Amino acid sequence: MNYYAAPMEGLTDRIWRQAHQRWFGAPEAPVRYYAPFLSPPENRVLIKKKMAELEPAANPGVQVIPQLLAKDGELAAWMIGELRRMGYTEVNLNFGCPSGTVTAKGKGSGMLRDPQKLDAFLDAVFSQAGGPVSVKTRLGVARAEEFGEILDVYNKYPLCELTIHPRVMKQLYRGQADREAFAAYLPACTAPVCYNGDVTTVDDLRALEAAFPELSGIMVGRGLIADPALLRKAVGGLAASREELRGYHDELYHGYTETFGMASCAVSRMKAHWFYLIHLFDGADALEKPLRKAREGWEYETVVNQIFACWPK
């Protein structure tokens, strides 16, 4: 089974990808990392700072798949061409993001409101794709039954892979992923299918592999931030040790401090990781409030040392 790290804005950036690969990468279970979405500029002028995340030199030894968030097929096709010139083979199209600020612009899962517009978008992309294109999607806007018409559109095109998150746009991340709907639509998919949604434990991975052996892959998001060793454990490897987690944390923290130029900005980014990661530490729940209140580097470092003193769980 192929394992993929889901794109998560503010979490799975180049610094995290490098740290995760270094500390928890498993040769027997190589991970493909999907980068957080990039929106192509309407004036077709690339912003160097935004593109720096995807520079091959910034991602050595890591297999990265760039993801596009767009509603203009011609503009997306142009951006795919730019990414191919950077050396990327596969490019992923985001029709899954449920954020209101995204869908209000008709992007992400907002594209699923109108299958005809979705069809026109994909037609423009594939008429000049020049290589593999994959899609990440939800089942629809309000009802899982909408996916029949949406899937008819996807099946018209040679997608190299279709990643399905079996929720609808209006759910955001509430409720449970609809695996019954996923199972019902899976046989009708002509592209290789990857599953994404509510995968947080090794048991979840094994259950999916047993239920759907035909899957091309499984994509893990929040579960991998909460347990960086999750995919290593899935192939029989060890759980994360205290020393590994400390090295992983320090690489992230120092990497963000160097990138942002000040520890206080790095602290803000690290809090997003600790929201998930803290549950690996026994009794550390009591330190969540002091962690949230920390602003300066020294305050943050003091709390983090206390958290690591709580190991093991």
Label every model-predicted segment.
Residues 1-313:
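Flavin-dependent oxidoreductase catalytic cores
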